[in-house]
Each structure stands twice: as structure tokens, then as C-alpha cells.
UniProtKB/Swiss-Prot annotation:
It comes from Anoxybacillus flavithermus (strain DSM 21510 / WK1). GO terms for cellular component: plasma membrane. The keyword Methyltransferase does not apply. This is Elongation factor 4. The keyword Cell membrane applies. It comes from the Bacteria. InterPro entries: EF-4, EFG_III/V, EFG_V-like, EFTu-like_2, G_TR_CS, LepA_C_sf, LepA_CTD, LepA_IV. Its EC number is 3.6.5.n1. PROSITE patterns: G_TR_1, G_TR_2. GO terms for biological process: positive regulation of translation. The lineage of its organism: Bacteria, Bacillati, Bacillota, Bacilli, Bacillales. The gene is lepA. It is a peripheral membrane protein.
Length: 608
């Protein structure tokens, strides 16, 4: 193509994404748009066409991004090229959302006509506003009996401050309002700007690993043009590659000659390692590089850590390979080898949040058939020692001696919780219990309240979200952002079996709740660890101080069975002999800890 054709093509491109809270109908709307523009035939339409991971469809959430090129003939007779970039709505994947929004000029904001605005809708709208996107409100699910579009329209204006007078009333399920949405995309979302002849600048907004082609980078070209055979350079890492092919998704991959300004597509360059195509990085030409990269790139830091160990130790290398493969598609996943006396060899893994952690564990079991055991999730603590050194501790068993510690700081998050006002009490009680600091309370309308709390991240990683959902009958929505570190009275609790520490059962706990927590765990372990031939004390200790204890009773053989009637001294002799034997056994015996015992420490239902 020459310059004129490229510019003409650029003016007909519209790049947009869809933002919505979970379950407000984003994937269904995407399906309808694909159907309307003829991207998928009737035969190929399956629910949630863009959610290609089996797990995504099963959980009904979008984890990875997808980008599709659609062709739409508008009412003005022009043929437009629409690029729909799908975004995940879950709080763990905020960075993925911000990158996919950076690749767009506009966003469709989907709000459920019955539910109204929820916490994650807000979080994502603010990201869109930060990226200066044109936002088109769509009020979805108007076919529901409980729909109240006028109230929601008012809410969009009051809470977000968007003009919702032209908001499209739609029902993606039934197919109402889809034409209007497409027309609004064409008329209201601006065409991309940028010069097709300038030095190349392309934003990587996702990457995935293909066993045959290496890494496939999903890119949005902001300036310049890229073709097969050119040498490219990644601006964050400085590595250079040669482009093998470029193409677009219609949702299936289709090779094209070039990608130019405004295009969204993919490129392969026999890149072996996904960490070379960092999401948010800028691709430029190696021989004619751009002066500076596109803004907004940052390295993702994991927030939650846990140990993953194969149940069958022989599969250690399989686990490493599986994690490496998952890391190819998931730059946020980090792992390094670690060993534990109790569990053998495994990996310490870092995740963005809890959902991310669960999904990785589930994919290891599902896609790679590796049975794993996970230790309790923990966060990164900053430990200041009396000699002035500062440590970052992400594994409870690395916590130094209490005598050496001057203070410990833990990460805090600012949590925004939206909840119907009938449930404000239980939610505030939950936050109090989790050591929350009350920030602010605002009424959105007569029915809904936004609460702001500062909470320790460590209190959220266990079961906060589950309890929040169950205490509000599923109505609360929750979003959090990291605000920094604060000093806390934290101690490390060790669990001793038969007088020996079991490193994998250690955890860090707030001093005030240490006693209760220790008691519950000790009782739980007593029931889970099988009885031995000798009695086994189970103890919880902080430093050298034992704070809770329970005993697993010994299994005993009835040594008196042979004595009929016999003399009491004869019986006593046999019992004494048995006792001696048990004592000897106890000195040499070791205790096997079953899988469930580790799980018990994590899944403390009655945690507090």
C-alpha cells in the first residue's frame, strides 16, 4: 500500500474495547457484534466466542485478552474496520485491562439494567478515562423483568459523570440495540491518529506462546508500518528479532502483508521467550528506532506468594516445564525453586492476586495433569532488623528470629466495597475483624453504599472475598489497590510435631489473633494426622514459647488379651513393658504428615 491508501485505511479504523463488571453481559455482547458483522458463521457461534480457554468459559470470566478484526458496512455506505479488544473484568487483571485500553480510542461501557454500576465497572471506567478514551454507555439486559434503565441512566450520570442521554438500551441476549451500538462506534469513536511513514511504534498488549511459531505478540500499531522480514527491537529489553509474519484475527489468525497505523493484529518473530515480549512494551525498528517508547509500561510485581510442590516428587521437572509454559502466556507469573523438609522440592510462585493463583493451580492440574500441593498464600513483608538491615520476606519459614527484628511492615490495600445498604452492618463487621481501618462511606442512591477501607493484604488473601459474598448474599462487589506498607505487630507461628518444626506449616499471624489461631490449627491437625504407635504432641509456638498444644493418642495393642483372670502384678508387668517399648519408639519414630494437614492450615473455615 502507498501512503494515501494507508491514510485512507487509517481513517476507517475504529479501535474499541468493552468494559463491564463480571456478569453484566460483556462476552455475550461481543458474541452478538461478531455475529452481526459476519465474523463467525452460525455454525461457528458458540457462547462466549472470545473466551477461548476452557476454564474461562466454565467460570464465565475473561482472563486473557482477545483482539478481533471486524468489517462493518455503516449506514453512510462506507466500509469500516472495527477492532474489538476484549478485556478481563476482574481486579487481579487490572494491568491487562489498562494495556488493552491503551490500544483503543474508545470503550463501550456495559452496565446491567437491573444491577446498576458496580465496583469493578468504576475501576475500569477510571482506567478508560485516564487513557482519554471516548466512552459509549450501553445499558444491557433491558429484557429482564427487574430492569430499570432510567435509574441506571441517572446513576451513570451521577456516579461517573458521563452524559448518558444517548446511552443505547440493549439486550445482547435477545439481540436488541446491536445495530445502534455499531453505528455509535463508527460515529463517535475517533479514528486512530499517527503517521504511517514515521519510525515504528507498536504497543504489545498481550502475548501467547505457540509451540510451532514461538511467541505470538498481539500488537497495536501506533506509528509507522511493520512487515515480515524487517528487524525489530523491544524497547524495554533492547532485544532484536526478525519478523516472520504479521497478521490479524478474524477471530481465526489470518496472515496479511503489513500492519500499519491503527491496525491491531499479531506478529511472530521466532521469539523463544515470552519475557522478551513484555506486555506494555513498545516494538520499534532496529535500524530506525523511535526516540522514546509509548507511555504506561510497568513491570508487574506479584502480590501473593505460595509454594507449589508436586505430590509425586518424581514429577518435579514436569512441574517446572508446566510453569514455564504457563509463564509464556502469563508474564505476571513468577517462580523460583525452593525446598522444604516436609514437602521436598518445589517452587515458590508469585501471583497478582487470589483469582490468579487459583487459576494457575487449576490449569496445572487440568492442562498438565500434575497433582500439586500448595502451601498457605502469603504476601511480601518488609522486615527491619535491629542491626539496620531491611529484608523482604515472602515465605514465612524465612522470617528471622524475633529477637533480631526491630519492626515488621505489611502491605495495605485500599478496598472499595459497593453493597446494598441492608448489608452495611455485616460488611463493616467483617472489615473490623480483618483489622480494617474505616475510610469513608458514601450513598450512591437510596439503595446502595460505597465503603472505603484500608485493609492488610494478608487478611484479604485467605477468604475475605468468599465471606464478603456470603454475608451479603452475593450482592457486594469489591475492588482493591495497593497503597503501601504500614508497621504491624506480626509474629511467625511454627507448628511442632513430636517436638520437630514442620517448615511448610509455618505462617505469619497478627499477635492479637495468634492464640486463637494456634488453638484451632492444633486441634485440626490432631484430627487429620493419623495415629502412630506412640503418642505425638502437636504444638503451636511463637519463637520458643509454646502457646497451644494437643496430643495425638497412641494406638495400643491389647497386651492383656492372653491373661485370663491372672494376677494384677502380672498385668502391670505387661503394661509397663508396653509403655517402655512405646517410649523407645517415640525417640526414634518420625511422623508422616498427610496432604490434608497442609490444606487444613490454609482452609481454616473458622479462621478467627
Amino acid at each position: 500500500m502507498n501512503r494515501e491508501e494507508r491514510l485512507k485505511r487509517r481513517d476507517r479504523i475504529r479501535n474499541f474495547s468493552i468494559i463491564a463488571h463480571i456478569d453484566h453481559g460483556k462476552s455475550t455482547l461481543a458474541d452478538r457484534i461478531l455475529e452481526k458483522t459476519g465474523a463467525l458463521s452460525e455454525r461457528e457461534m458458540k457462547e462466549q466466542a472470545l473466551d477461548s480457554m476452557e476454564l474461562e468459559r466454565e467460570r464465565g470470566i475473561t482472563i486473557k485478552l482477545n483482539a478481533v478484526q471486524l468489517h462493518y458496512k455503516a449506514k453512510d455506505g462506507e466500509d469500516y474496520i472495527l477492532h474489538l479488544i476484549d478485556t478481563p473484568g476482574h481486579v487481579d487483571f487490572t494491568y491487562e485491562v489498562s494495556r488493552s485500553l491503551a490500544a483503543c480510542e474508545g470503550a463501550i461501557l456495559v452496565v446491567d439494567a437491573a444491577q446498576g454500576i458496580e465496583a469493578q465497572t468504576l475501576a475500569n471506567v477510571y482506567l478508560a478515562i485516564d487513557n482519554n478514551l471516548e466512552i459509549l454507555p450501553v445499558i444491557n439486559k433491558i429484557d429482564l423483568p427487574s430492569a430499570d434503565p432510567e435509574r441506571v441512566r441517572q446513576e451513570i450520570e451521577d456516579v461517573i459523570g458521563l452524559d448518558a442521554s444517548e446511552a443505547v438500551l440493549a439486550s445482547a441476549k435477545v439481540g436488541i440495540g446491536i445495530d445502534e451500538i455499531l453505528e455509535q462506534i463508527v460515529q463517535k469513536i475517533p479514528a486512530p491518529s499517527g503517521d504511517p511513514d514515521a519510525p515504528l511504534k507498536a504497543l504489545i498488549f498481550d502475548s501467547l506462546y505457540d509451540p510451532y511459531r514461538g511467541v505470538v505478540a498481539y500488537i497495536r500499531v501506533v506509528e509507522g508500518t511493520v512487515k515480515a522480514g524487517q528487524k525489530i527491537k523491544m524497547m524495554a529489553t533492547g532485544k532484536e528479532f526478525e519478523v516472520v509474519e504479521v497478521g490479524v484475527f478474524t477471530p481465526k489468525a489470518k496472515v496479511v502483508d503489513e500492519l500499519t497505523v491503527g491496525d491491531v493484529g499479531y506478529l511472530t518473530a521466532s521469539i523463544k521467550n515470552v519475557s522478551d515480549t513484555r506486555v506494555g512494551d513498545t516494538i520499534t525498528h532496529a535500524d530506525n528506532p523511535a526516540n522514546e517508547p509509548l507511555p504506561g509500561y510497568r513491570r508487574l510485581n506479584p502480590m501473593v506468594f505460595c509454594g507449589l510442590y508436586p505430590i509425586d516428587t518424581a514429577r518435579y521437572n514436569d512441574l517446572r516445564e508446566a510453569l514455564e509454559k504457563l509463564q509464556l502466556n502469563d508474564a505476571a507469573l513468577q517462580f523460583e525453586p525452593e525446598t522444604s523438609q516436609a514437602l521436598g522440592f518445589g517452587f515458590r510462585c508469585g501471583f497478582l492476586g487470589l483469582l490468579h493463583m487459583e487459576i494457575i493451580q487449576e490449569r496445572l492440574e487440568r492442562e498438565f495433569n500434575i497433582d500439586i500441593i500448595a502451601t498457605a498464600p502469603s504476601v511480601v513483608y518488609k522486615v527491619y532488623l535491629t542491626d539496620g538491615t531491611e529484608l523482604a520476606v515472602d515465605n514465612p519459614s524465612n522470617m528471622p528470629d524475633p529477637q533480631k527484628i526491630e519492626r515488621v511492615e505489611e502491605p495495605y490495600v485500599r478496598a472499595t466495597i459497593m453493597v446494598p445498604n441492608d448489608y452495611v452492618g455485616p460488611v463493616m463487621e467483617l472489615c473490623q475483624k480483618k483489622r480494617g481501618i474505616f475510610g469513608d462511606m458514601q450513598y450512591l442512591d437510596e439503595r446502595r453504599v460505597t465503603l472505603t477501607y484500608e485493609l492488610p493484604l494478608a487478611e484479604i488473601v485467605y477468604d475475605f472475598f468468599d465471606i464478603l459474598k456470603s454475608s451479603t448474599k452475593g450482592y457486594a462487589s469489591f475492588d482493591y489497590e495497593l497503597i503501601g506498607y504500614k508497621p504491624s505487630k506480626l509474629v511467625k507461628m511454627d507448628i511442632l510435631l513430636n517436638g520437630e518444626k514442620v517448615d511448610a506449616l509455618s505462617f505469619i499471624v497478627h499477635r492479637d489473633s495468634a492464640y486463637d489461631r494456634g488453638k484451632v490449627i492444633v486441634e485440626k491437625l490432631k484430627d487429620l494426622i493419623p495415629r502412630q504407635q506412640f503418642e505425638v504432641p502437636v504444638q503451636a509456638a511463637i519463637g520458643n514459647k509454646i502457646i497451644a498444644r494437643s496430643t495425638i493418642k497412641a494406638l495400643r495393642k491389647n497386651v492383656l488379651a492372653k491373661c485370663y483372670g491372672g494376677d494384677i502384678s502380672r498385668k502391670r508387668k505387661l503394661l509397663e513393658k508396653q509403655k517402655e517399648g512405646k517410649k523407645r519408639m517415640k525417640q526414634v519414630g518420625s511422623v508422616e504428615v498427610p496432604q490434608e494437614a497442609f490444606m487444613a492450615v490454609l482452609k481454616m473455615d473458622d479462621q478467627k
